[in-house]
């Protein structure tokens, strides 16, 4: 480093960067070696014998150097020692023929890379479309799923291209209609809402006449939950009703499409079966690792590997950008319809596919700046939905995959509706649409690394599931033993945790539309889910489903063994969420680690979010109860005990079959009908059906 001449004194001022080239004097080191000796520069100042010193200085006024200026000196090789440019050209000419051709090809590809890339994609797309057409020509019914997926993909690709290129033009084209709608929306919205309400009332009246009154009970339960949310709202006078009504409306439309229309039901049923088939491939890895008898330890070696496999697939889809694309589309739909903020929409859409601790990572940079209502909505969305990684585990329990998939989709708008009613927005959101919709593709460098990271990241989840089940089931056994011991002091040893929950949650389960005799059983399942976790609840539900499928007696020693199909369906929707006290700690810890500055707000709103998430699941179950076309259980006592001659109708046959299955016959004159039926009803069924499983001659003639 060299400094300016101290004799030159100039005042400090802002200076410009300058590059000064000047010859340097030869050093003693150069004179000691004859090969590097130079003539004195004053006597011979030729470019070939001089060195160039580049010095970058900060120049002052009139180019004078300052005392405190810093100068950087870079010594370069003498010009005379540089290789002649002719040598470079000679090396260039010495390249081989193949190397020159390779360089030519690379240069051509660089110049025409856009055209080449477009050509390759066009060839691949043409080949794929040719395969789709050929598959449809061979067997259209078999190729229908591929055809539909192809059409949907092409539609969204074209849509994204048009929106990216002509979004402003489309917006300008539609702006006159939007302005016209805004001018008349004040009175038009009342016409729209009144028409919708009248249509719902008319539809419910006709549907109730067709399927029974239980569907009407589900509608009453939906209204009851909305009233409760409004009464206990954080700011009941500040409720913005658009997201509430639109959330329930989207729930209803999705449920109507899936549960009542044949194309929708067939599509989701097909998706459910494909998911089950896809999850079945987990058995190959489990069999290789744990051996042929891996099913002997069903949960550890059959269920938990599904979580690993599903986590791997989700990580790969996230690397490819497909998950982010789907989340953006679903979030955009909820944003434009419900009027929710971009942050809320993205997180609610993300919770359909990923867990309650992963979805906030989609908007991690914005969490310190969200409002309290938005933070409450983020937590509510996590409690009201389940993760895709555990969805496969619930399906493997034997729970309907169609209903689980439907519940996962319907719960997203329900969470937004409940959250905005239970904690209305009183501040102005700071995050815009474009900033919230930006999502990263992860830190994986290739697809295999993404798969490996997905499998590795599932290890804590699998360990957490296994550890929690061991702890909670052991705790449940202890609590039941303690309650039984306490109840025995009052001559009631039947006291248990399930019994207490059945009375606490029975009104809620009944108002969802569950049959009265099944409401206590569903209430027990809700208790398992709320105080332990949904794994315990779905495990008990799967046992009830298996007992029904086994067609055993519905009552054994006066104890009901299983539920109706309608009650199972409603219970599936009510349990489909992470709303439990175990998840409460997970959410508080996870969000606090992401946004430490919001720790106080997270802790204060978590309990309300847990309640809101639970009610969101209940409202989804109410929608399922309204739209479910599964016939409710027949009042068999009214059918069989009315004293009339029985006719061979579907209702009578069903009631008689249930009566035969629940009857205990030990011998002549020793027959006990099940379900509190009389011997008269049993005799009437015997005269009608002549069952092979029961000796009707054992029934006493004198009744």
Swiss-Prot record:
It comes from the Eukaryota. This is Solute carrier family 28 member 3. Homotrimer. Belongs to the concentrative nucleoside transporter (CNT) (TC 2.A.41) family. The keyword Cell membrane applies. It is a multi-pass membrane protein. Disulfide bonds: none annotated. It holds the Pfam family Nucleos_tra2_N.
């Amino acid at each position: 480093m060299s400094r300016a001449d101290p004799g030159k004194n100039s005042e400090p001022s802002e200076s410009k960067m300058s590059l000064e080239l000047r010859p340097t004097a030869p050093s003693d080191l150069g004179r000691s070696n004859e090969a590097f000796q130079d003539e004195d520069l004053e006597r011979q100042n030729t470019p070939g014998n001089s060195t160039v010193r580049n010095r970058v200085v900060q120049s002052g006024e009139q180019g004078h150097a300052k005392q405190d200026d810093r100068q950087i000196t870079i010594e370069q090789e003498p010009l005379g020692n540089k290789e002649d440019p002719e040598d470079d050209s000679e090396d260039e000419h010495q390249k081989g023929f193949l190397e020159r051709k390779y360089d030519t090809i690379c240069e051509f590809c660089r110049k025409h890379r856009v055209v080449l890339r477009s050509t390759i994609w066009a060839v691949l797309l043409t080949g794929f479309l040719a395969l789709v057409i050929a598959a449809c020509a061979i067997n259209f019914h078999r190729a229908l799923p591929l055809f539909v997926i192809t059409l949907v993909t092409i539609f969204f690709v074209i849509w994204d291209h048009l929106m990216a290129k002509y979004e402003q033009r489309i917006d300008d084209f539609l702006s006159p209609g939007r302005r016209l709608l805004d001018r008349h929306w004040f009175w038009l919205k009342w016409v729209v809402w009144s028409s919708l309400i009248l249509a719902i009332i008319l539809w419910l009246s006709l549907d109730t006449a067709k399927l029974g009154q239980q569907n009407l009970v589900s509608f009453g339960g939906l209204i009851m939950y909305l009233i409760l949310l409004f009464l206990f709202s954080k700011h009941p006078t500040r409720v913005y009703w658009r997201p509430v009504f639109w959330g329930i409306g989207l729930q209803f439309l999705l449920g109507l499409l899936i549960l009542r229309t044949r194309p929708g039901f067939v599509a989701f049923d097909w998706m459910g079966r494909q998911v089950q088939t896809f999850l079945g491939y987990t058995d190959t890895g489990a069999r290789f690792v744990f051996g042929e008898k891996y099913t002997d330890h069903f949960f550890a070696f059959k269920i938990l590997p599904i979580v690993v496999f599903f986590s791997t697939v989700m990580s790969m889809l996230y690397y490819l950008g497909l998950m982010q694309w789907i989340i953006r589309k679903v979030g955009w739909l909820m944003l434009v319809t419900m009027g929710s903020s971009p942050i809320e929409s993205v997180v609610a859409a993300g919770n359909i596919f990923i867990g309650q601790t992963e979805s906030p990572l989609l908007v991690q940079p914005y969490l310190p700046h969200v409002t309290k209502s938005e933070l409450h909505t983020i937590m509510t969305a996590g409690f009201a939905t389940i993760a895709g990684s555990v969805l496969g585990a619930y399906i493997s329990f034997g729970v309907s995959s169609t209903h689980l998939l439907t519940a996962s989709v319907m719960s997203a708008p329900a969470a937004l509706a409940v959250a905005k009613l239970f904690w209305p927005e009183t501040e102005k959101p700071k995050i815009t649409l474009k900033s919230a919709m930006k999502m990263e593709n992860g830190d994986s460098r290739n697809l295999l690394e993404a798969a490996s990271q997905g499998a590795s990241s599932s290890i804590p989840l699998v360990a957490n599931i296994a550890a929690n089940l061991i702890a909670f089931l052991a705790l449940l056994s202890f609590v039941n033993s303690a309650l039984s011991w306490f109840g025995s002091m009052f001559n009631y040893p039947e006291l248990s945790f399930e019994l207490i929950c059945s009375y606490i949650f029975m009104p809620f389960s009944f108002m969802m539309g569950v049959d009265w005799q099944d409401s206590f059983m569903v209430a027990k399942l809700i208790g398992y889910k709320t105080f332990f976790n949904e794994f315990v609840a779905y495990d008990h539900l799967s046992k009830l489903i298996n007992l029904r499928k086994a067609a055993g007696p519905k009552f054994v020693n006066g104890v009901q063994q299983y539920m109706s199909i309608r009650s199972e369906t409603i219970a599936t929707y009510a349990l489909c969420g992470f709303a439990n006290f175990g998840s409460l700690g997970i959410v508080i810890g996870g969000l606090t680690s992401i946004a430490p500055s919001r720790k106080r707000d997270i802790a204060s709103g978590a309990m309300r979010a847990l309640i809101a998430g639970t009610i969101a699941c209940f409202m989804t179950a109410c929608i399922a109860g309204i739209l479910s076309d599964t016939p409710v259980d027949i009042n068999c006592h009214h059918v069989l005990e009315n004293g009339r001659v029985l006719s061979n109708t579907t209702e009578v046959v069903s009631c008689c079959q249930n009566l035969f299955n629940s009857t205990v016959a030990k011998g002549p004159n020793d027959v006990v009908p099940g379900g509190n039926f009389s011997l008269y009803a049993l005799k009437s069924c015997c005269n009608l059906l002549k069952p092979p499983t029961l000796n009707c001659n054992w029934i006493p003639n004198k009744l």
